[in-house]
């Protein structure tokens, strides 16, 4: 089993020349490769895309076999991928998914990091995170609009809707957290983001998600103060450890206007540098003494969360951004770790009730002009949403594409299928140079059960019921998505979540149009169904408005 290969540089094909037998197999092939593009993945030489050890394939041997199989796969065959390893090709039919993926799934009693890590060391499993192992990660843009929407709502609730002259304190500039600085600036606030790995800061500077960086706290705070005085937001990366810096900042009287965290706290061994440790110490200990790292990281998280609680008690609006750090601190004895809320119940759930979530698409042509044309089409089809238009304008101006050109755009039931059909027509007419793939994050309305994140504090107490993502995956399979994935542990770590993903290809054919109409209606509708079942009136009203047939609910 080979997981490190420094000789590999993976980039997807672009243009209209196929390297597989059809666009339905070319698309997953290009998106798998895109996940490992050097401008996209965090550690592509190790197959790590983002989120600690979130991989695109189990090992390089498995990667090569997936590529080889996709290139020979017929349009009436389906490839099965088990935790990043291709295990079977079966005859199905043209409207069935071309790939079905299951990553990191464990029987609940054994769903722990300890058991998973043992399987991982033996080469029997792979951590797929959410979009790493499901081949639809598009770089930090994939989370930036959701982060922007969250920060805007925080500003509305806590600062009268105006974040000018305000600043956000956070930590973590990895594949998800790296979106925070740009999202904050887009929302009108400055951002001070602490990060312990220089390579991550450098990547965010290179891709335009971060304006400045320093190793000195005093310099970082001076830049923030200057920007706030001018009401000209700036994003600053500060090299350091959050578990050391947050308590020191609180003791020194520093008070941000907003506070959150996106360190990779979900994975104590691979994702969180213990306070007082160097990166070299950490790298060595992860291999030789993983339990020592685990204990030290968890102890540091307790200090980190206590500092966040101290800031909250001092009046700073504080929110958990879904990395399970509160749970880790609770287990370390911080009894009131959950005193600050998660971002979904605090800010996002009303959107989920209407099936609104992180809809995304990528241009297989590799031409940014295709994304510009689809942006214009979104504005044309949804003309009365100035907030959405503002987002698209900002994205076009500020977001640098990583790998294949792509766009994230939060839309919901009633709009997703219209956009998909319009994109398909643009491919058919030649307006777009090549097909597009349409997918989403697993963090969506009906595709995840995660009691410490997406389904935290459901009004009926159904936080941990994971039937819903299973039904979502089954429904998308039956509806004709091009590939469907079912994962465990994404975002919050082993034992704390189950979630499903789907991707569908718009290749300009009539057959694709029929699949798009089904999938892009049913997928968000299942989210409305889930929230209506939980008792949310917004979801029930949405279901009635769109004529959903929910016999046991309405």
UniProtKB/Swiss-Prot annotation:
Pathway: Amino-acid degradation; L-histidine degradation into L-glutamate; N-formimidoyl-L-glutamate from L-histidine: step 2/3. One of its GO terms (molecular function) is urocanate hydratase activity. Its main location: cytoplasm. One of its GO terms (cellular component) is cytoplasm. Binds 1 NAD(+) per subunit. InterPro entries: Urocanase, Urocanase-like, Urocanase_C, Urocanase_central_sf, Urocanase_CS, Urocanase_N, Urocanase_Rossmann-like, Urocanase_sf. NAD(+) binds at residues 51-52, 129, 175-177, 195, 200, 241-242, 262-266, 272-273, 321, 491. Its cofactor is NAD(+). Belongs to the urocanase family. This is Urocanate hydratase.
């Amino acid at each position: 089993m080979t997981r490190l290969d420094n000789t590999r540089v993976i980039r997807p094909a672009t243009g209209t020349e196929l390297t597989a037998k059809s666009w339905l197999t070319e698309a997953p092939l290009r998106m798998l490769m895109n996940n490992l593009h050097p401008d996209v993945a965090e550690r592509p030489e190790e197959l790590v895309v983002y989120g600690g050890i979130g991989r695109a394939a189990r090992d390089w041997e498995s990667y090569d076999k997936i590529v080889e199989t996709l290139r020979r796969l017929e349009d009436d065959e389906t490839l099965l991928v088990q935790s990043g390893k291709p295990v079977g090709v079966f005859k199905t039919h043209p409207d069935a998914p071309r790939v079905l993926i299951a990553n990191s799934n464990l029987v609940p009693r054994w769903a722990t990091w300890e058991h998973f890590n043992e399987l991982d060391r033996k080469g029997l499993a792979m951590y797929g995170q959410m979009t790493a192992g499901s081949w639809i990660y598009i770089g930090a843009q994939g989370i930036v609009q959701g982060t922007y929407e969250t920060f805007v709502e925080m500003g509305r609730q806590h600062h009268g809707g105006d974040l000018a002259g305000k600043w956000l304190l956070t930590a973590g500039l990895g594949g998800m957290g790296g979106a925070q600085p740009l999202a904050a600036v887009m929302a009108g606030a400055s951002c001070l983001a602490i990060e312990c790995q220089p390579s991550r800061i450098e990547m965010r500077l290179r891709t335009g998600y971060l304006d400045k960086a320093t190793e000195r706290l005093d310099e970082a705070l001076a830049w923030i103060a200057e920007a706030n005085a001018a009401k000209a937001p700036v994003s600053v990366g500060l090299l350091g450890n959050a578990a050391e810096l947050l308590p020191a900042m609180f003791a020194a009287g520093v008070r941000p206007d907003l506070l959150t965290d996106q360190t990779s706290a979900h994975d104590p061994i691979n994702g969180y540098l213990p306070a007082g440790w160097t990166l070299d110490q950490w790298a060595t200990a992860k291999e030789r003494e993983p339990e020592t790292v685990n204990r030290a990281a968890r102890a540091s998280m307790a200090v980190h969360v206590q500092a966040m609680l101290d800031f909250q008690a001092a009046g700073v609006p504080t929110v958990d951004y879904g990395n399970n750090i509160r749970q880790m601190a609770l287990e370390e004895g911080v009894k009131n770790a959950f005193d600050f809320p998660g971002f979904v119940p605090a800010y996002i759930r009303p959107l989920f009730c209407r099936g609104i979530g992180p809809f995304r698409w990528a241009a297989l042509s590799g031409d940014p002009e295709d994304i510009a044309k689809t942006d214009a089409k979104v504005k044309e089809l949804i003309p009365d949403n100035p907030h959405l238009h503002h987002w698209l304008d900002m994205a076009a101006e500020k977001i640098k594409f990583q790998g294949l050109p792509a766009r994230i755009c939060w839309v919901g039931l009633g709009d997703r299928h219209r956009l998909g059909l319009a994109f398909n027509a643009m491919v058919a007419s030649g307006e777009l140079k090549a097909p597009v793939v349409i997918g989403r994050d697993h963090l969506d309305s009906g595709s995840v059960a995660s009691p410490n994140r997406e389904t935290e504090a459901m009004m009926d107490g159904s936080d941990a019921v994971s039937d819903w993502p299973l039904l979502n995956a089954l429904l998308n399979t039956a509806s004709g998505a091009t590939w469907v994935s079912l994962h465990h542990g994404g975002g919050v770590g082993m034992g704390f979540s189950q979630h499903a993903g789907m991707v569908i290809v718009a290749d300009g054919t009539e057959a694709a149009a029929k699949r798009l109409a089904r999938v892009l209606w049913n997928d968000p509708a299942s989210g409305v169904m889930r929230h209506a079942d939980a008792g949310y009136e917004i979801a029930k009203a949405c279901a009635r408005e769109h004529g959903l047939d929910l016999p046991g609910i309405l």
